[in-house]
A protein has these predicted regions:
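Histidine-acidic metal/acid-base catalytic patches
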Residues: 2-23, 28, 32-43, 113, ...
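Active-site acidic/histidine proton-transfer and metal-coordination neighborhood
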Residues: 12-17, 72-74, 87-188, 279-280
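Active-site-proximal loop/turn and secondary-structure-junction residues that shape catalytic pockets
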Residues: 28-30, 54-56, 84-87, 122-124, ...
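N-terminal substrate-binding region of glycoside hydrolase catalytic domains
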Residues: 41-61, 82-86
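Residue-level detector of anion-binding/catalytic polar loops
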Residues: 48-49, 77, 114, 153, ...
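Conserved beta-strand positions in the central sheet of alpha/beta enzyme cores
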Residues: 51, 80-82, 117, 155, ...
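Glycine-rich, proline-tolerant flexible connector loops at the mouths of alpha/beta enzymes
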Residues: 51-74, 120-128, 163, 223-226
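Metal-dependent catalytic neighborhoods of phosphoester/phosphodiester hydrolases
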Residues: 61-67, 92-95, 128-130, 261-265
Length: 281
Protein backbone atom coordinates (compact mmCIF):
# COMPACT_ATOMS: atom_id res chain seq x y z
CA UNK A 1 0.00 0.00 0.00
CA UNK A 2 1.85 3.08 -1.22
CA UNK A 3 0.25 6.02 -2.94
CA UNK A 4 2.77 8.81 -2.34
CA UNK A 5 6.50 8.76 -1.59
CA UNK A 6 7.31 9.13 2.09
CA UNK A 7 9.46 12.13 1.24
CA UNK A 8 6.24 14.00 0.56
CA UNK A 9 5.69 14.24 4.31
CA UNK A 10 8.51 16.46 5.50
CA UNK A 11 6.41 19.38 6.63
CA UNK A 12 8.58 21.99 8.30
CA UNK A 13 7.35 24.92 10.32
CA UNK A 14 5.50 27.34 8.06
CA UNK A 15 7.25 30.71 7.61
CA UNK A 16 4.37 32.53 9.31
CA UNK A 17 4.78 30.25 12.34
CA UNK A 18 8.25 31.69 13.06
CA UNK A 19 9.91 28.27 13.26
CA UNK A 20 7.27 26.74 15.54
CA UNK A 21 5.10 23.74 14.69
CA UNK A 22 1.37 23.55 15.41
CA UNK A 23 -1.12 20.73 15.02
CA UNK A 24 -4.78 20.03 15.71
CA UNK A 25 -6.25 16.89 17.26
CA UNK A 26 -8.92 16.09 14.70
CA UNK A 27 -11.47 14.69 17.15
CA UNK A 28 -12.02 18.24 18.46
CA UNK A 29 -13.34 19.48 15.10
CA UNK A 30 -17.00 19.29 14.05
CA UNK A 31 -18.07 15.69 13.49
CA UNK A 32 -19.95 16.71 10.36
CA UNK A 33 -16.68 17.35 8.52
CA UNK A 34 -15.01 14.72 6.37
CA UNK A 35 -11.32 13.96 6.87
CA UNK A 36 -10.48 16.07 3.83
CA UNK A 37 -12.55 18.97 5.16
CA UNK A 38 -10.81 18.71 8.52
CA UNK A 39 -7.46 18.98 6.75
CA UNK A 40 -8.65 22.02 4.82
CA UNK A 41 -9.73 23.65 8.08
CA UNK A 42 -6.34 22.97 9.68
CA UNK A 43 -4.56 24.44 6.68
CA UNK A 44 -6.82 27.50 6.58
CA UNK A 45 -5.97 28.17 10.24
CA UNK A 46 -2.24 28.08 9.42
CA UNK A 47 -1.33 24.77 11.05
CA UNK A 48 1.53 22.46 10.09
CA UNK A 49 0.03 19.17 11.16
CA UNK A 50 -2.83 17.10 12.49
CA UNK A 51 -3.20 14.32 15.04
CA UNK A 52 -5.40 11.32 14.34
CA UNK A 53 -6.93 8.39 16.18
CA UNK A 54 -7.42 5.05 14.47
CA UNK A 55 -9.67 6.23 11.67
CA UNK A 56 -7.10 5.37 9.01
CA UNK A 57 -7.42 1.66 9.84
CA UNK A 58 -10.87 1.76 8.22
CA UNK A 59 -9.85 3.56 5.06
CA UNK A 60 -10.32 1.85 1.71
CA UNK A 61 -7.55 2.02 -0.91
CA UNK A 62 -9.47 4.85 -2.54
CA UNK A 63 -9.69 6.66 0.82
CA UNK A 64 -5.94 6.32 1.23
CA UNK A 65 -5.24 7.71 -2.21
CA UNK A 66 -7.58 10.67 -1.73
CA UNK A 67 -6.53 11.52 1.83
CA UNK A 68 -2.80 11.23 1.19
CA UNK A 69 -3.17 13.43 -1.86
CA UNK A 70 -4.96 16.04 0.26
CA UNK A 71 -2.28 15.95 2.96
CA UNK A 72 0.40 16.34 0.31
CA UNK A 73 -1.41 19.16 -1.49
CA UNK A 74 -1.86 21.12 1.75
CA UNK A 75 1.66 20.42 3.03
CA UNK A 76 0.30 18.94 6.26
CA UNK A 77 2.02 16.38 8.45
CA UNK A 78 0.42 13.74 10.67
CA UNK A 79 2.54 14.31 13.74
CA UNK A 80 0.89 11.78 16.09
CA UNK A 81 -1.61 8.93 16.11
CA UNK A 82 -3.42 6.96 18.81
CA UNK A 83 -2.94 3.24 18.02
CA UNK A 84 -5.12 1.80 20.79
CA UNK A 85 -5.86 1.64 24.50
CA UNK A 86 -4.41 -1.11 26.65
CA UNK A 87 -3.68 -1.21 30.37
CA UNK A 88 0.10 -0.81 30.36
CA UNK A 89 0.34 -2.25 33.88
CA UNK A 90 -1.47 -5.47 32.87
CA UNK A 91 0.93 -8.05 31.46
CA UNK A 92 -2.02 -10.11 30.22
CA UNK A 93 -2.65 -7.29 27.70
CA UNK A 94 0.86 -7.56 26.23
CA UNK A 95 -0.30 -9.46 23.14
CA UNK A 96 -3.08 -6.95 22.51
CA UNK A 97 -0.57 -4.11 22.79
CA UNK A 98 1.77 -5.80 20.35
CA UNK A 99 -1.07 -6.41 17.91
CA UNK A 100 -2.22 -2.78 18.15
CA UNK A 101 1.27 -1.54 17.41
CA UNK A 102 1.89 -3.96 14.56
CA UNK A 103 -1.46 -3.06 13.01
CA UNK A 104 -0.82 0.66 13.38
CA UNK A 105 2.74 0.80 12.08
CA UNK A 106 2.05 0.29 8.33
CA UNK A 107 -0.56 3.05 8.25
CA UNK A 108 1.60 5.36 10.36
CA UNK A 109 4.53 4.87 8.00
CA UNK A 110 2.29 5.61 5.02
CA UNK A 111 1.18 8.82 6.74
CA UNK A 112 4.73 9.75 7.71
CA UNK A 113 3.71 9.66 11.38
CA UNK A 114 6.61 9.19 13.79
CA UNK A 115 4.82 9.31 17.15
CA UNK A 116 2.18 7.24 18.93
CA UNK A 117 0.16 8.53 21.87
CA UNK A 118 -0.53 6.12 24.72
CA UNK A 119 -2.17 6.49 28.11
CA UNK A 120 -1.43 3.97 30.85
CA UNK A 121 -5.18 3.35 30.98
CA UNK A 122 -6.74 1.28 33.78
CA UNK A 123 -5.07 0.31 37.04
CA UNK A 124 -4.73 -3.36 37.96
CA UNK A 125 -6.55 -3.60 41.34
CA UNK A 126 -4.36 -6.29 42.88
CA UNK A 127 -1.10 -4.46 42.17
CA UNK A 128 0.69 -2.27 44.68
CA UNK A 129 1.79 1.15 43.38
CA UNK A 130 5.34 -0.18 43.13
CA UNK A 131 4.24 -3.21 41.14
CA UNK A 132 2.16 -1.03 38.86
CA UNK A 133 5.08 1.29 38.17
CA UNK A 134 7.41 -1.62 37.44
CA UNK A 135 4.88 -3.22 35.09
CA UNK A 136 4.36 0.01 33.14
CA UNK A 137 8.10 0.55 32.83
CA UNK A 138 8.52 -3.02 31.58
CA UNK A 139 5.72 -2.64 29.03
CA UNK A 140 7.13 0.62 27.68
CA UNK A 141 10.57 -0.95 27.30
CA UNK A 142 8.92 -3.75 25.34
CA UNK A 143 7.06 -1.25 23.15
CA UNK A 144 10.22 0.79 22.54
CA UNK A 145 12.00 -2.33 21.29
CA UNK A 146 9.10 -3.12 18.94
CA UNK A 147 9.18 0.38 17.45
CA UNK A 148 12.95 0.76 17.20
CA UNK A 149 13.39 -0.34 13.60
CA UNK A 150 10.54 1.87 12.39
CA UNK A 151 11.83 4.99 14.14
CA UNK A 152 8.55 5.65 15.97
CA UNK A 153 8.29 7.21 19.44
CA UNK A 154 5.67 6.74 22.13
CA UNK A 155 4.53 9.68 24.23
CA UNK A 156 2.93 8.68 27.53
CA UNK A 157 -0.09 10.84 28.34
CA UNK A 158 -1.29 11.13 31.96
CA UNK A 159 -5.06 11.48 32.34
CA UNK A 160 -6.62 13.24 35.32
CA UNK A 161 -8.87 11.31 37.71
CA UNK A 162 -11.84 13.58 37.00
CA UNK A 163 -11.86 12.18 33.48
CA UNK A 164 -10.97 8.57 34.25
CA UNK A 165 -11.26 7.40 37.86
CA UNK A 166 -9.26 4.22 37.29
CA UNK A 167 -6.39 5.80 35.36
CA UNK A 168 -2.99 4.32 36.24
CA UNK A 169 -0.83 7.39 35.49
CA UNK A 170 -2.50 10.67 36.41
CA UNK A 171 0.28 13.28 36.58
CA UNK A 172 3.26 14.29 34.50
CA UNK A 173 5.38 13.99 37.65
CA UNK A 174 4.87 10.23 37.62
CA UNK A 175 5.10 10.05 33.83
CA UNK A 176 8.50 11.77 33.85
CA UNK A 177 9.73 9.37 36.52
CA UNK A 178 8.53 6.40 34.46
CA UNK A 179 10.21 7.59 31.27
CA UNK A 180 13.47 8.09 33.13
CA UNK A 181 13.26 4.49 34.36
CA UNK A 182 12.54 3.26 30.85
CA UNK A 183 15.63 5.17 29.70
CA UNK A 184 14.82 4.97 25.99
CA UNK A 185 14.93 7.89 23.55
CA UNK A 186 11.78 6.35 22.04
CA UNK A 187 9.67 7.01 25.16
CA UNK A 188 8.73 10.56 26.14
CA UNK A 189 5.85 12.37 27.86
CA UNK A 190 2.84 14.11 26.37
CA UNK A 191 2.42 17.15 28.61
CA UNK A 192 -1.30 17.88 28.39
CA UNK A 193 -1.77 21.12 30.32
CA UNK A 194 -5.53 20.59 30.52
CA UNK A 195 -5.25 17.24 32.30
CA UNK A 196 -2.36 18.38 34.51
CA UNK A 197 -4.18 21.51 35.66
CA UNK A 198 -7.22 19.44 36.63
CA UNK A 199 -5.10 16.87 38.44
CA UNK A 200 -2.26 18.73 40.12
CA UNK A 201 -1.49 22.23 38.79
CA UNK A 202 2.01 23.73 39.14
CA UNK A 203 2.32 23.53 35.37
CA UNK A 204 5.33 25.71 34.63
CA UNK A 205 7.75 24.39 37.27
CA UNK A 206 7.25 20.81 36.08
CA UNK A 207 7.70 21.90 32.48
CA UNK A 208 10.90 23.75 33.33
CA UNK A 209 12.45 20.81 35.19
CA UNK A 210 11.56 18.13 32.66
CA UNK A 211 11.65 19.74 29.21
CA UNK A 212 14.13 17.15 27.87
CA UNK A 213 11.51 14.44 28.37
CA UNK A 214 8.62 16.34 26.75
CA UNK A 215 7.75 14.88 23.36
CA UNK A 216 4.53 16.78 22.73
CA UNK A 217 2.27 19.33 24.42
CA UNK A 218 -1.53 19.59 24.27
CA UNK A 219 -3.41 22.84 24.76
CA UNK A 220 -6.92 23.41 26.20
CA UNK A 221 -8.27 25.65 28.94
CA UNK A 222 -9.86 24.59 32.22
CA UNK A 223 -12.76 24.19 32.77
CA UNK A 224 -14.56 23.17 29.61
CA UNK A 225 -11.69 22.16 27.29
CA UNK A 226 -12.11 25.23 25.09
CA UNK A 227 -9.57 27.67 23.66
CA UNK A 228 -7.03 29.52 25.85
CA UNK A 229 -8.58 32.56 27.48
CA UNK A 230 -11.88 30.87 28.30
CA UNK A 231 -10.71 29.47 31.64
CA UNK A 232 -8.15 29.65 34.42
CA UNK A 233 -4.88 28.58 32.77
CA UNK A 234 -2.39 31.37 31.98
CA UNK A 235 -1.25 30.14 28.59
CA UNK A 236 0.70 33.32 27.92
CA UNK A 237 3.11 32.35 30.71
CA UNK A 238 3.23 28.73 29.52
CA UNK A 239 4.07 29.78 25.96
CA UNK A 240 6.75 32.16 27.21
CA UNK A 241 8.31 29.32 29.19
CA UNK A 242 8.21 27.07 26.11
CA UNK A 243 9.98 29.86 24.24
CA UNK A 244 12.62 30.28 26.97
CA UNK A 245 13.25 26.53 26.90
CA UNK A 246 13.53 26.54 23.09
CA UNK A 247 10.86 23.87 22.78
CA UNK A 248 10.88 22.82 19.11
CA UNK A 249 8.35 20.00 18.91
CA UNK A 250 4.67 20.15 18.08
CA UNK A 251 2.18 22.26 20.01
CA UNK A 252 -1.19 20.58 19.54
CA UNK A 253 -4.48 22.38 20.05
CA UNK A 254 -6.81 19.82 21.62
CA UNK A 255 -9.76 22.01 22.50
CA UNK A 256 -13.33 22.37 21.27
CA UNK A 257 -13.48 25.84 19.71
CA UNK A 258 -16.18 28.26 20.87
CA UNK A 259 -16.99 30.21 17.73
CA UNK A 260 -15.81 29.81 14.17
CA UNK A 261 -13.15 27.05 14.26
CA UNK A 262 -10.79 28.63 11.73
CA UNK A 263 -10.91 32.03 13.43
CA UNK A 264 -10.47 30.57 16.92
CA UNK A 265 -7.65 28.18 15.96
CA UNK A 266 -5.79 30.85 14.03
CA UNK A 267 -6.04 33.23 17.00
CA UNK A 268 -4.77 30.53 19.38
CA UNK A 269 -1.81 29.83 17.11
CA UNK A 270 -0.90 33.50 16.75
CA UNK A 271 -1.18 34.05 20.51
CA UNK A 272 1.28 31.22 21.10
CA UNK A 273 3.73 32.54 18.51
CA UNK A 274 3.61 36.06 19.93
CA UNK A 275 4.29 34.89 23.48
CA UNK A 276 7.12 32.54 22.51
CA UNK A 277 8.75 35.08 20.23
CA UNK A 278 8.65 37.73 22.96
CA UNK A 279 11.32 35.85 24.93
CA UNK A 280 13.40 34.68 21.97
CA UNK A 281 14.29 38.05 20.44
Amino acid sequence: MSFLPSSSFTAAALPENEGHKFSIMLWTLPKSLTFEQQLELASAAGFNGVEVGREYEKWTPEDWKRNLAKLHALGLEVDSAVPGRNALADHSKRTALRDDLMNAIPGAKELGCKQFIYTAFTRVPEQTPEQQRAAIVDTLKYAADLLEKDGIEIVLEPIDLLEHKQEAVTSVTEAFEITREVASPRIKVLYDFYHEQRQAGNLIEKLDKNIAKVGLVHIADVPGRHQPGTGEVNYGNIYRKLGELHYDRYICMEFSPIGDPVTVLKAARLEAISAMQSVQK
